[in-house]
A protein has these predicted regions:
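Structural preference for beta-strand elements that scaffold enzyme active sites
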Residues: 2-9, 40, 62-67, 98-101, ...
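Acidic-and-aromatic substrate-binding clefts and catalytic sites of carbohydrate-active enzymes
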Residues: 40-52, 71-82, 149-154, 176-182, ...
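Active-site acidic/histidine proton-transfer and metal-coordination neighborhood
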Residues: 58, 77-171, 179, 272
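Active-site mouth loops of central-metabolism enzymes
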Residues: 11-25, 71-81, 114-121, 229-231
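Acidic (Asp/Glu)-rich catalytic clusters
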Residues: 1-2, 30-35, 48-65, 83-97, ...
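Acidic/histidine-rich catalytic cores of soluble enzymes
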Residues: 7, 127-234, 285-288, 292
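Conserved, mostly hydrophobic/aromatic
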Residues: 7, 33, 41, 56, ...
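C-terminal helical cap(s) of enzyme catalytic domains, especially alpha/beta-barrels
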Residues: 265-290
Length: 292
């Protein structure tokens, strides 16, 4: 029984959000992943790995896929979003990856503001997803929608509406789902056939509630420690892994801990936190393998 584990640059503070924090060099991030025994990674934000096959292969890693947040609800921007998805898919395919992880961006910087969509904008979003699916699958890749804080597919109601209106599978991100007010395990059990990809995160429920209530912005919450190593927060990682495994999921378990590095942050922190998460995840996998 094999569980495929990958990491992602966001655990080292590498984000597409302007002003997010200090960005560590790719060689350091990838070499630390490899040093922890992780053999696969997602791409990171656009431009972070300009030549994925070379730099990832040099560190003994394989490419899983990449995250892409683009506006899909605005008819005037849809063409550009489809083109960006096509370019991203080509880069991932060239690097040997298999999936584009899509998020329905608002068009604003960051994830702190989220205008509501009317029915026409929602219909455009769904149609843009269809068009993006076409260009991504043309490259031999899969695509999955990532419900994400501060996007147009965030809340439980929006996720259910999306599943009803689009055949696209989901990337279940345990942290973003919980922050957005969705029980990730319950969602996986309701829709076992729609699980396309998995991001394993853990979060503090107290800070998640503050974000949900609008009292704390997402970026501020991240800086205050919203995301923690697996097993240290309020997500039931083991229940999630057991649920998707029972549903027949054989894809990647991508370990993530959204992190922002300030001027005085300890650059060794991401490696230590990822190591702790890996220990917890390995214990979960061991119990499942042993039938416990």
């Amino acid at each position: 029984m094999t569980f495929k584990v990958a990491a992602a640059p966001i655990s080292w503070g590498v984000s597409e959000v302007p002003g997010w924090g200090r960005i560590l060099e790719p060689e350091r991030v990838l070499s630390e992943m490899a040093g922890l025994g992780v053999h696969a990674t997602e791409l990171g934000p656009p431009g972070y790995l300009p030549d994925p096959p070379t730099i990832i292969g040099r560190n003994g890693l394989e490419l899983v896929g990449g995250f892409l947040a683009v506006p899909m609800h605005d008819a005037s921007a849809a063409e550009g979003s489809v083109a960006e998805a096509s370019a991203t898919a080509k880069k991932i395919a060239a690097g040997g990856g298999e999936i584009v992880v899509l998020a329905a961006a608002t068009g604003l910087d960051g994830y702190d503001g989220r205008p509501q969509l009317d029915d026409a904008q929602w219909a455009t979003l769904i149609d843009t997803c269809r068009r993006i699916t076409e260009v991504v699958t043309a490259e031999g890749l899969r695509v999955a929608m990532h419900p994400h804080v501060g996007t147009h597919v965030e809340t439980e109601a929006e996720i259910e509406r999306f599943l009803a209106d689009s055949p696209m599978p989901l990337c279940l991100d345990t942290g973003h789902l919980l922050v957005g007010g969705t029980d990730p395990v319950a969602l996986a059990e309701r829709h076992p056939t729609r699980i396309g990809h998995l991001h394993l995160k853990d979060v503090r429920a107290d800070l998640a509630a503050e974000v949900r209530a609008g009292r704390v912005g997402f970026a501020d919450a991240v800086a205050r420690g919203l995301f923690v190593p697996l097993g240290d927060g309020d997500v039931d990682t083991e229940a999630m892994v057991r649920s998707v495994h029972a549903a027949g999921y054989h894809g990647w378990y991508v370990l993530e801990q959204d992190t922002a590095l300030g001027p005085d942050s300890d650059d060794c922190g991401p490696r230590r936190n990822t190591a702790r998460s890996l220990v917890h995840l390995d214990e979960v996998f061991s119990r499942i393998r042993e039938g416990r």
